[in-house]
């Protein structure tokens, strides 16, 4: 393998949603260099940050019907029992909810926590308060999705934050997703909530770091089964 290929292998690919932003930052950097060199270097740093924000590395996902993997890179902020939002249609009984907060330094490509069929997608306009606050799940702009699996229905909510002003979804109702498959992203800091079927057991705790498509969040096992892995 050549040196160029070795370097390329170490650099994660960039998601296509980031191309316009990276190009914009690069153009601004050139203009800043023309005005004053130190400002240009600040622009270069911001361009690199933007590229890192939209990075889309390959992830190796554990594949088993009863495992729930992290839908986002970030920090587990809450593991609680909560009544799911009405738009999910999951009833009024409290369910296990695991929340992941993404800072502006995390990779923001979102991945399916389970394999299954998309049963519902509901967009709800709202505010843009700090996504790390509990009330953000009800007050903020969000995109809610329900995935049907053999073990029950999983609710996944993309929640906009203080800086995040754009939720992007790549999927449609009726689409079948694989565990760890990309389904959307949120631009510039946000949160994801995952609502799990009754009886699910959380395998993470608040403060733990999560890696989208790899970190196992919970188990709703119906029986013993082996674990395999799939790169995505």
From Swiss-Prot:
PTM notes: Is synthesized initially as an inactive proenzyme. Formation of the active enzyme involves a self-maturation process in which the active site pyruvoyl group is generated from an internal serine residue via an autocatalytic post-translational modification. Two non-identical subunits are generated from the proenzyme in this reaction, and the pyruvate is formed at the N-terminus of the alpha chain, which is derived from the carboxyl end of the proenzyme.
Catalytic center residues: 190 (schiff-base intermediate with substrate)
Cofactor: pyruvate
Topology with respect to the bilayer: Peripheral membrane protein
Sites annotated Cleavage (non-hydrolytic): 189-190
Gene Ontology terms, MF aspect: phosphatidylserine decarboxylase activity
Subcellular location(s) of the protein: Cell membrane
Swiss-Prot/TrEMBL catalytic activity: a 1,2-diacyl-sn-glycero-3-phospho-L-serine + H(+) = a 1,2-diacyl-sn-glycero-3-phosphoethanolamine + CO2
Entry's transmembrane regions: none
Highest taxon of source: Bacteria
GO biological process: phosphatidylethanolamine biosynthetic process
InterPro entries to which the protein is assigned, alphabetical: PS_Dcarbxylase, PSD-A
Documented EC number(s): 4.1.1.65
Modified sites of kind Pyruvic acid (Ser): 190
Key words, A-Z: Cell membrane, Decarboxylase, Lipid biosynthesis, Lipid metabolism, Lyase, Membrane, Phospholipid biosynthesis, Phospholipid metabolism, Pyruvate, Zymogen
GO cellular component terms, A-Z: plasma membrane
The record's free-text note on cofactor binding: Binds 1 pyruvoyl group covalently per subunit.
Function: Catalyzes the formation of phosphatidylethanolamine (PtdEtn) from phosphatidylserine (PtdSer).
PANTHER family: ARCHAETIDYLSERINE DECARBOXYLASE PROENZYME-RELATED
Homology family: Belongs to the phosphatidylserine decarboxylase family. PSD-A subfamily.
Assembly, per entry: Heterodimer of a large membrane-associated beta subunit and a small pyruvoyl-containing alpha subunit.
Protein name: Phosphatidylserine decarboxylase proenzyme
Species lineage: Bacteria, Pseudomonadati, Pseudomonadota, Alphaproteobacteria, Hyphomicrobiales
Gene encoding the protein: psd
């Amino acid at each position: 393998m050549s040196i160029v290929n070795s370097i390329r292998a170490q650099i994660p690919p960039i998601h296509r949603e980031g191309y316009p932003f990276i190009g914009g930052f690069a153009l601004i950097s050139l203009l800043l260099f023309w005005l004053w060199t130190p400002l240009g270097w600040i622009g270069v740093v911001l361009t690199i940050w933007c590229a890192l924000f939209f990075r889309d590395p390959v992830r190796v996902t554990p594949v088993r019907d009863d495992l729930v993997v992290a839908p986002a890179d970030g920090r587990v902020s809450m593991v609680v029992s909560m009544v799911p939002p009405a738009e999910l249609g999951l009833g009024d009984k409290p369910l296990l909810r695991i929340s992941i907060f993404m800072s502006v330094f995390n990779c923001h490509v979102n991945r399916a926590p389970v394999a299954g069929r998309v049963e519902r997608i509901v967009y709800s306009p709202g505010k843009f308060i700090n996504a790390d606050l509990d009330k953000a799940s009800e007050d903020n702009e969000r995109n809610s999705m329900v995935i049907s699996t053999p073990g029950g229905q999983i609710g996944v909510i993309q929640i906009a934050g203080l800086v995040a002003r754009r939720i992007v979804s790549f999927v449609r109702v009726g689409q079948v997703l694989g565990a760890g498959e990309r389904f959307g992203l949120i631009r510039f800091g946000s949160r994801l909530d995952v609502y799990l079927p009754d009886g699910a057991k959380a395998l993470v705790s608040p403060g733990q770091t999560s890696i989208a498509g790899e970190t196992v969040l919970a188990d709703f096992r119906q029986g013993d089964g082996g674990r395999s892995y799939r790169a995505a």
